[in-house]
């Protein structure tokens, strides 16, 4: 459900649910199709406006008033990008909240690494969202209360919460990947997590 919270959207008078991802993550939509199940096609399109004009993305959209109604009951909003709120209290059992957060991370976060100019390996992960969403993540992961959020640009309602990964805070990724299975996680980010885990172990 976290992935839908991040990359999904409600259309057509709350009857249709759509999910759009970068073309490189099309396999994740194929997994979603298998779980629903959904027999329609995954569309491939090109961005025509904004700062990624020409880049390709994949999308599925289908009519499911029941699913949309259930998601809205849990707190998903239409036109949510700038006003996204956490799920309604109690709508996600405590033992599944880390799966929800991982879905958000798969949709709107990143896990990556690079070698800096001094030849040192640097790894980081970050969560992206409204202040309400980041506070929800902080409350449930229970990371440091003084962790700072960075506004993406002036007057933007979306903020970034970034961690430079180390042996002492690898538990953050361990937590969100706990009990995850291949059919529900984004392969590309999971592989990055394994690389970081191997490096620090």
Regions found by a protein language model. Give the residues of each.
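Internal intein/HINT superfamily modules and their associated LAGLIDADG
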Residues: 1-201
């Amino acid at each position: 459900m976290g992935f839908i919270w991040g990359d999904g959207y409600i259309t057509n008078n709350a009857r249709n649910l759509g999910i759009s991802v970068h073309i490189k993550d099309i396999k994740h939509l194929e997994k979603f199709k298998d779980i629903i199940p959904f027999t329609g096609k995954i569309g491939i399109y090109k961005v025509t406006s904004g700062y990624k004009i020409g880049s390709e993305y994949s999308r599925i959209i289908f009519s499911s008033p029941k699913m949309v109604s259930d998601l809205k009951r849990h707190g998903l909003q239409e036109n949510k990008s700038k006003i996204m709120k956490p799920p309604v209290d109690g709508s996600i059992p405590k033992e599944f909240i880390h799966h929800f957060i991982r879905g958000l991370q798969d949709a709107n976060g990143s896990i990556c690494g690079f070698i800096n100019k001094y030849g040192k390996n640097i790894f980081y992960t970050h969560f992206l969202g409204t202040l309400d969403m980041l506070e929800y993540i902080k409350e449930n992961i229970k990371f440091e209360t003084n962790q700072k959020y960075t506004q993406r640009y002036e007057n933007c309602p979306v903020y970034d919460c970034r961690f430079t990964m180390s042996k002492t805070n690898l538990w953050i990724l361990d937590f969100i990947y706990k009990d995850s299975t291949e059919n529900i996680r984004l392969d590309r980010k999971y592989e990055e997590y394994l690389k970081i885990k191997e490096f620090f172990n």
